[in-house]
Amino acid sequence: METARLLFVHAHPDDETLTTGATIAHYVARGAQVHVITCTLGEEGEVIGDEWAQLAVDRADQLGGYRIGELTAALAELGVDRPRFLGGAGRWRDSGMDGTPARQQQRFVDGDFAEQTATLAAAIDELRPHVVVTYDPNGGYGHPDHIHAHRVTTAAVAASTWQVPKLYWTVTSSSALAAALASMGAVPEEWIRVSADDLPLFGYSDEAIDAALDLTAHESARVAALRAHRTQVSVSPDGRSFALSNNVALPVDPTEYYVLAAGSAGARDERGWETDLLSGLSVG
């Protein structure tokens, strides 16, 4: 049987772990060929703590290069041998959130869309993935680079010579997030507890979700990968929750959720969900 191949397209270092980390580890453990393409170096990220604060964009502006090392370490924890960057490391700069001033380097959202699409399409033709994973049209939570990564990936899948059998969006389950936030255990005292009502941009209904992967067996790998992104992510001592620079406490969910954007679904369970992104494909 042909070896399964999966490609994950993400906007910044750490996104691969935050949204699809356990999925990546799962398919690597199954013997699949897994590649991660990151579109920027995450130069505009907010730095947690004082140790690496001088790397930030308003100081030395060296964060992007440092985050290559973080990404490399995180991918190693997930079983991926090396990072890949769209157009090469540093080709397009992190765009920052809405309102972030443009820098000298061309931002990802301002780049030549045709060039970006052709570059990713060439990678798809090289890697020939059976499954491609990226964000939904809102980029998960509205970040301009996530939205742009969705658009570029969608266009590249359509433009590539290789016919990708299945395209998925990584999404959050509204019901699972609400339950996990409500039942979350002790967190560091400086973290901020919120409810699902405080996170209006997050979440899909159960009816809108197509796949849910129970990845409990790979949560330790995901937590180790989260810890590798130390300038961006703080992880609780017990590994059950994490926070970004805003100190909002979020659960480490053992299940990762997906919407099938293109292709045919395989077998579904009693909830109407696939439990394997490779379901319906003749690959191992």
Curated annotation (Swiss-Prot):
It catalyses: 1D-myo-inositol 2-acetamido-2-deoxy-alpha-D-glucopyranoside + H2O = 1D-myo-inositol 2-amino-2-deoxy-alpha-D-glucopyranoside + acetate. It is an enzyme of class 3 (hydrolase). The keyword Hydrolase applies. The keyword S-adenosyl-L-methionine does not apply. Gene3D superfamilies: LmbE-like. GO terms for molecular function: N-acetylglucosaminylinositol deacetylase activity; zinc ion binding. GO terms for biological process: mycothiol biosynthetic process. Signal peptide: none annotated. Binds 1 zinc ion per subunit. It comes from the Bacteria. Its cofactor is Zn(2+). Its EC number is 3.5.1.103. Zn(2+) binds at H12, D15, H146. Keywords: Hydrolase, Metal-binding, Zinc. Belongs to the MshB deacetylase family. Catalyzes the deacetylation of 1D-myo-inositol 2-acetamido-2-deoxy-alpha-D-glucopyranoside (GlcNAc-Ins) in the mycothiol biosynthesis pathway. This is 1D-myo-inositol 2-acetamido-2-deoxy-alpha-D-glucopyranoside deacetylase.
